[in-house]
C-alpha cells in the first residue's frame, strides 16, 4: 500500500504546537497515534467523504465522531441555515419561536420528552441533567455508567480536578446489575440520579448491547428508591431510533440527554424529561449561556 503524502498536515501540525497545547485537543491527541501519520488536517467534506490539506480523500466512517448523520454539506439543511442568517439573524441570546417547534418535535418522538431544555454540547446536557436530578430529589450522590463528557464530575482524566469532586460520584459497569444493586444498597438514601448510556460505550472500549433485564432492572431500582433515571443518549439518540434507544429497548427514563446527530453537525444538545422532574429548572436550578438559544442550530435540527 502506498504511503499517504501528509506533508501539508505535518507542516500545520508543527505550527499548531506553538499555538495550541499539544496541537490538537480531545481524545484524538497526537500522542495516541503513530508519529508522522497524524494529526491529519481536513480541508473539506461532501456527503460521506472528507479531504485533507494534501488532497487525500477518505470515507468518514466516524461521521465526524457522530454529528454528521446525513452527510457533510447537506444542501437542504445548509440552505435553511443560510436563510436564517440572511433574513432573520441568529444570535439574540433570547428565546426564539424555533425553540417551541423543536420541543414539540422531540415530544412527539421521545417517550420521556414532556419538556426540553436546549444547550450546545453533550457535556452541557449531561451536567445539566445531573444538576436537575440533584435539585429534584434534594440528594447528592450520582451513580454513573459510561462516558458522559469532559466536565469535572465525570471526566475520565482527573488532571486539574480536586479529588473531593468524586466523593459523591460512583461508577458501575455496564450490564453488571448485581454491582449496581450493591452500590444502590450502600448509598441508596442519598442517590439523586443514575445516569447510563443505554447502549454501552465505555471510553475506548467496544460497544455493548444491554443484557435482558439490565435497563429494566435500573428502572425498577430507581423507581423504588425515588432516584432519577437518566439515559445519556448523546450517541444513541436519532441513531438507534429517532426516539432514542429507550424506544426499541422499551424502558422510559425520567430524563434523557441528546446531541451529536441532532442537527447534522450544527452544535446543539438537549435535556428532555418528565415535567415532574424538569420543573425545578423553572426557578431553583440555574442553566444559562449566551449561546444556548441559537436559531441556526434550531432550524438545522428541525430540518434534520
What are these regions (language model features)?
Residues 2-304:
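Conserved N-terminal phosphate-binding loop of PLP-dependent enzymes in the Aspartate aminotransferase
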Amino acid at each position: 500500500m502506498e504511503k499517504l503524502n501528509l506533508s501539508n498536515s505535518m507542516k500545520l501540525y508543527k505550527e499548531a504546537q506553538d499555538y495550541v497545547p499539544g496541537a490538537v485537543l480531545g481524545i484524538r491527541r497526537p500522542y495516541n497515534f503513530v508519529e508522522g501519520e497524524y494529526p491529519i488536517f481536513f480541508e473539506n467534506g461532501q456527503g460521506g467523504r472528507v479531504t485533507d490539506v494534501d488532497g487525500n480523500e477518505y470515507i468518514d466512517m466516524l461521521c465526524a465522531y457522530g454529528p454528521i448523520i446525513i452527510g457533510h454539506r447537506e444542501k437542504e439543511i445548509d440552505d435553511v441555515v443560510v436563510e436564517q442568517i440572511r433574513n432573520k439573524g441568529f444570535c439574540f441570546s433570547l428565546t426564539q419561536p424555533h425553540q417551541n417547534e423543536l420541543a414539540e418535535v422531540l415530544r412527539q418522538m421521545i417517550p420521556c420528552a414532556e419538556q426540553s431544555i436546549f444547550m450546545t454540547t453533550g457535556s452541557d446536557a449531561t451536567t445539566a441533567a445531573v444538576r436537575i436530578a440533584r435539585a429534584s430529589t434534594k440528594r447528592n450522590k450520582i451513580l454513573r455508567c459510561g462516558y458522559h463528557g469532559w466536565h469535572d464530575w465525570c471526566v475520565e482524566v482527573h488532571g486539574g480536578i480536586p479529588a473531593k469532586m468524586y466523593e459523591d460520584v460512583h461508577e458501575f459497569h455496564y450490564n453488571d446489575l448485581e454491582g449496581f444493586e450493591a452500590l444502590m444498597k450502600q448509598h441508596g438514601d442519598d442517590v439523586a440520579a443514575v445516569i447510563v448510556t443505554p447502549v454501552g460505550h465505555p471510553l475506548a472500549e467496544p460497544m455493548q448491547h444491554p443484557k435482558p433485564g439490565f435497563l429494566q432492572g435500573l428502572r425498577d431500582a430507581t423507581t423504588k428508591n425515588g432516584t432519577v433515571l437518566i439515559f445519556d443518549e448523546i450517541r444513541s439518540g436519532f441513531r438507534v431510533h429517532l426516539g432514542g434507544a429507550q424506544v426499541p429497548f422499551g424502558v422510559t427514563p425520567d430524563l434523557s440527554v441528546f446531541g451529536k446527530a441532532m442537527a447534522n453537525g450544527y452544535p446543539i444538545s438537549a435535556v428532555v424529561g418528565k415535567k415532574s422532574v424538569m420543573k425545578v429548572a423553572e426557578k431553583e436550578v440555574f442553566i444559562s449561556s449566551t449561546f444556548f438559544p441559537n436559531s441556526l442550530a434550531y432550524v438545522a435540527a428541525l430540518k434534520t
